[in-house]
Amino acid sequence: MTSTPIERAVYIVSDSTGITAETFSHSVLSQFDEVNFKPVRLPFIDTLDKAREVVARINRNALEAGVPPIVFSTLVNPEILALVRQSNGVFLDLFGTFVSHIEQALGLKSSHSIGRSHMAANSEKYRNRIDAINFSLAHDDGQFVNQLDQADVILVGVSRCGKTPTSLYLAMQYAVKAANFPLTPDDFERGALPKTIAPYRGKLFGLSIQPERLAEVRNERRPNSHYARLEQCRYEVAEAERMMRREGISWLSTTTKSIEEIATTVLQEVGLERV
């Protein structure tokens, strides 16, 4: 008999987008498998009236659940921060925890600027990300090949092994121009890389996946098809890995890895800088 997972509400409160708090909370809470966390995202809490509504919501949850919810905060405004801190939650001030120590180390006061880490609308970094996203979308699944020389990395692997989400994550998070190209049964029969990507061997990085997991994913897309049969998946995965080993292409299995882990490994293996 399996025990019922513990449930706990998690409030992610920010006076900007909340992306920083959400990313941090996800990394921390993923360490507790036995708890079913229920995230509630509350971005743009930038007035005292909004803060009072947040406090009421947190207090109501604490009363109904019988346990205090966890509150991750990247609030910068001192008044709003002080108000939300008084709620009946386990309050975690992410900026305050680190900023005060850095202020002491530098002998300086921080600017307390809301959303400073995301104010990039007109910056070169923002434009680079947009360019990378457009590139990755245009070069998804081998559909456009005329500018592969401009790619920072070309992900290769069998269909549905995770190439597209990894390409887009690299583009959105790190401004990496990531193309992706499928390895197909036709390539395995020829025993060679597709001619289109062969000249860019130095840019190639492979993704693989366990056949059983691949069959599950493919069955969601094309149920009961030859494409989704376990035998076909085993054949394609084995042939793709054999080809990557023969061609000297670094690769990893995506089966048990998060998109963040996959992307970080690609960056390290290919030698790309994080932007």
UniProtKB/Swiss-Prot annotation:
UniProt catalytic activity: [pyruvate, water dikinase] + ADP = [pyruvate, water dikinase]-phosphate + AMP + H(+); [pyruvate, water dikinase]-phosphate + phosphate + H(+) = [pyruvate, water dikinase] + diphosphate
Function field: Bifunctional serine/threonine kinase and phosphorylase involved in the regulation of the phosphoenolpyruvate synthase (PEPS) by catalyzing its phosphorylation/dephosphorylation.
Protein family according to the UniProt entry: Belongs to the pyruvate, phosphate/water dikinase regulatory protein family. PSRP subfamily.
Native source organism of the sequence: Bordetella parapertussis (strain 12822 / ATCC BAA-587 / NCTC 13253)
Entry protein name: Putative phosphoenolpyruvate synthase regulatory protein
HAMAP family per the UniProt record, alphabetical: PSRP
InterPro entries according to UniProt: Kinase-pyrophosphorylase, PSRP
Keywords: Kinase, Nucleotide-binding, Serine/threonine-protein kinase, Transferase
Molecular function in Gene Ontology: ADP binding; ATP binding; phosphotransferase activity, phosphate group as acceptor; protein serine/threonine kinase activity
EC number: 2.7.11.33, 2.7.4.28
Domain of life: Bacteria
